[in-house]
């Protein structure tokens, strides 16, 4: 059955159900039923009483509907009176991954690290390893993933600043961040999404850039993304919050007056009140710990309007593993030469 024809059946079922529904919802049990895991508790076809959604292959009716969010509908072909049917799955487009064809809503594991599902011609995958959920703490500004013999998932280890300078790559206390305006659960990509963390800002003060590499695009090709970033202002701006006496570090500072971002010869259209990382008096440096990305409109010469991704600081961390200005960005450029950028 095609999705269009199935939709017509669903509308017809709802019309029949409306003819058999009571005028008042006063016969529901006092306690709602207990449903099996992954089975939703929904209202019956009359919109009165809570019932457990029927699953694929189970009997169904207007009072016991199927779980529609799983692509199920009640098939009444065997009952001309349309009173009792069977939950069936809507047909959808199949998926092809690594030469293997998967049916709509079929789940599979392309590797031990990912669990994927075919959703009407598109493949959506979720990681099975919890590296991004159990991140190192603020005392580990230079985390590195290592393979463990005999195990599928990698583990975090903390390197010192000296070890990273020899031949490694550090993110300088950066952590995975949320991108404002972008749906991270988008399943329109027919490949396993891979995205590195954002690099440290190329400037310790003033406007700089940070970058990451991702394949989240229509062609699933690895591309470098660049965003503007400002860890702190190079000049002491009026309106800073004054730190308390006796404190050696101020992790986060915020202006009381809105400011405009400046990029080359362009200025942000709207003023903002961003958070900046503070300073320490005991030799430690403060770098972003949790960030987001938002798109900011800039007005350029000839009144040209452009949008640029800009880092938004949520929290900062103070530590002794201080990154050198621009060094981490130069290391990343050496690791991914020739990649297209978005800035």
From Swiss-Prot:
Subcellular location: Secreted; Cytoplasm; Cell junction, Gap junction
Function of the molecule: Immediate-early protein playing a role in various cellular processes including proliferation, adhesion, migration, differentiation and survival. Acts by binding to integrins or membrane receptors such as NOTCH1.
Domain TSP type-1 residues, every copy: 190-235
GO CC terms of this entry: cytoplasm; extracellular matrix; extracellular space; gap junction
Domain IGFBP N-terminal: 19-90
Secretion signal, residue range per the UniProt entry: 1-18
Keywords tagged on the record: Cell junction, Cytoplasm, Disulfide bond, Gap junction, Glycoprotein, Growth factor, Secreted, Signal
Molecular functions (GO terms): growth factor activity; heparin binding; integrin binding
Domain VWFC: 93-159
Protein name, entry field: CCN family member 3
Domain CTCK: 249-323
Known glycosylation sites: 265
One Pfam family here: TSP1_CCN
Protein's UniProt keywords contain Repressor: no
Family: Belongs to the CCN family.
Main localisation: secreted
Disulfide bond found in the keyword field: yes
Disulfide bonds: 21-46, 25-48, 28-49, 35-52, 60-74, 66-87, 249-286, 266-300, 277-316, 280-318, 285-322
SUPFAM superfamilies according to UniProt: Growth factor receptor domain, TSP-1 type 1 repeat
GO biological process: cell adhesion; chondrocyte differentiation; positive regulation of cell differentiation; signal transduction
């Amino acid at each position: 059955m095609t999705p269009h024809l199935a939709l017509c059946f669903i509308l017809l079922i709802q019309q029949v159900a409306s003819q058999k529904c009571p005028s008042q919802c006063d016969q529901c049990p006092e306690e709602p039923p207990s449903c099996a895991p992954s089975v939703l508790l929904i209202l019956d076809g009359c919109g009165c009483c809570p019932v457990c959604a029927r699953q694929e292959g189970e009997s169904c009716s207007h009072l016991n509907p199927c779980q529609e969010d799983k692509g199920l509908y009640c098939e009444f072909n065997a009952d001309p009176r349309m009173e009792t049917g069977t939950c069936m799955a809507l047909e959808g487009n199949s998926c092809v991954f690594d030469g293997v064809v998967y049916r709509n809503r079929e789940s599979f594991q392309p590797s031990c690290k990912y669990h994927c599902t075919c959703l009407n011609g598109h493949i959506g995958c979720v990681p099975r390893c919890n590296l991004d959920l159990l991140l190192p703490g603020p005392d580990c500004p230079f985390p590195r993933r290592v393979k463990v013999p005999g195990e599928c998932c990698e583990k975090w280890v903390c390197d010192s600043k000296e070890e990273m300078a020899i031949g490694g790559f550090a993110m300088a206390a950066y952590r995975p961040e949320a991108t404002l305006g972008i749906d991270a659960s988008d399943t329109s990509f027919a490949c396993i999404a891979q995205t590195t963390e954002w690099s440290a800002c190329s400037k310790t003060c003033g406007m700089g850039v940070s970058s990451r590499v991702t394949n989240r695009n229509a062609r699933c090709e690895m591309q470098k993304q660049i965003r503007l970033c400002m860890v702190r202002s190079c000049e002491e701006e009026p309106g800073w919050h004054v730190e308390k006496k006796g404190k050696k570090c101020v992790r986060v500072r915020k202006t009381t007056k809105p400011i405009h971002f400046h990029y080359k010869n362009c200025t942000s259209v709207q003023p903002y009140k961003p958070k900046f990382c503070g300073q320490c008096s005991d030799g430690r440096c403060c770098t972003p710990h949790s960030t987001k990305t938002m798109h900011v409109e800039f007005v350029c010469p000839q009144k040209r309007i452009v949008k640029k991704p800009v880092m938004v600081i949520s929290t900062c961390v103070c530590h002794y593993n201080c990154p050198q200005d621009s060094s981490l960005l130069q290391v990343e450029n050496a690791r991914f030469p020739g990649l297209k950028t978005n800035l």
